[in-house]
A protein has these predicted regions:
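Metzincin-family zinc-dependent endopeptidase catalytic domain
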Residues: 103-269
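C-terminal motif of bacterial Sec signal peptides marking the signal peptidase cleavage site
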Residues: 4-7
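Short, histidine-centered active-site or binding-site loop motifs used for metal coordination
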Residues: 86-90, 211, 290
């Protein structure tokens, strides 16, 4: 999730070591990304045995898909195009994001997931060998739904996703990626549901309107990367630090790091976990750095995302529209 609620980071002035203080070391800005996706996920898993079962099945299916890829059993079946419904909840003119800004956000998603973003050339040479390139996922705007509201703030309780609580009901969540834009969410930039929630009434992505799209968005999160990050969660990516000190994001080619990074770190940035010092991939879309400092997915992340939109994947329903 991108509100980056548990926003934390490290910079290269004071390199991070396992077990060190996790207070973010801010580089370049006082405003930090906040994403609550993983916190919300863990709460949902704790309260639902059905979701826990789906989660386990998805992870097992992902592992099989990864092994089949390694064995050459998975052939390219072309790019998957995901239809998107943008649900705009607004109180003020600035919160009523324009059609042009929505188109701009869809364009950012398409560039970032195709690996054609203009800043892809900034990927350091040490990570060139594991960059995702084209994830083979595209996004097509299917509809925009707008609704005026008197609410001055929103939280992560999913009220924006139900008409009965002042929001907008999702459009066929099994078959469409629903994105809700809302006004103020405090320190949260956005959040998303993971594939085990596929088809549920609350399935989709939420983004605070100041961080949606580019034109008129708030710096340093004004390049549309909040959506890139949150859609990554929607497609089964975890935060790159595994939401724990030297945690596991279930991706083999992303270096283990002590915690999240924020601001605009200078490369190289080193962390030490289990006594091993590594240069970390802070420019990954699943970290917490500023929009201008993130510009890549890894090949391992690509495989995880492809597994959920495959014909046997948890989000295969997105393929039929």
């Amino acid at each position: 999730m991108l509100s980056f609620l548990s926003a934390c980071n490290s910079d290269n002035v004071s390199n991070q070591t396992e077990g060190s203080e996790n207070t973010p070391a801010i580089s370049g800005t006082a405003l930090q990304r906040g994403c609550a996706s993983e916190e919300i996920r863990q709460a949902a898993l704790k309260n639902s045995s059905e979701l826990r079962q789906k989660y386990s099945e998805i992870e097992a299916r992902t592992e099989r898909f990864e092994n089949d890829m390694k064995l050459g059993k998975v052939l390219s079946d072309g790019t998957v195009e995901i239809p998107v419904v943008v649900n705009v909840l607004y109180r003020t003119t600035s919160e009523n994001v324009s059609d042009a800004r929505i188109a701009e956000q869809i364009a950012v998603l398409n560039a970032d997931y195709a690996g054609t973003n203009t800043d892809v050339s900034k990927i350091p040479s040490e990570f060139q060998g594991v960059k995702a390139g084209d994830v083979k996922v595209r996004f097509r705007l299917a509809n925009v739904v707008r609704k005026s509201t008197t609410k001055t703030s929103w939280s992560t309780n999913d009220a924006m996703k139900k008409a009965s609580t002042g929001g907008i009901d999702a459009t066929s969540p099994s078959n469409y990626l629903n994105i809700w834009t809302v006004g103020n969410m405090g320190q949260i930039l956005g959040y998303a549901t993971f594939p085990e929630s596929s088809g549920l009434w609350n399935d989709g992505v939420v983004i605070a309107s100041p961080y949606f799209g580019k034109t008129g968005a708030s710096s340093p999160f004004n390049l549309g990367r909040t959506a890139t990050h949150e859609v990554g969660h929607y497609l089964n990516l975890r935060h790159i630090w595994g939401d724990a000190n030297c945690g596991n994001d279930l991706v083999a080619d992303t270096p283990t790091q002590t915690t999240s990074n924020a601001g605009k770190p200078s490369y190289p940035l080193y962390n030490t976990c289990s006594g091993v010092q590594r240069s970390v991939m802070f420019m990954n879309y699943m970290d917490y750095v500023d929009d201008a400092a993130m510009f890549m997915f890894s090949a391992g992340q690509k495989t995880r995302m492809q597994s959920v939109v495959a014909s046997s994947g948890a989000r295969s329903g997105l393929r039929i529209n």
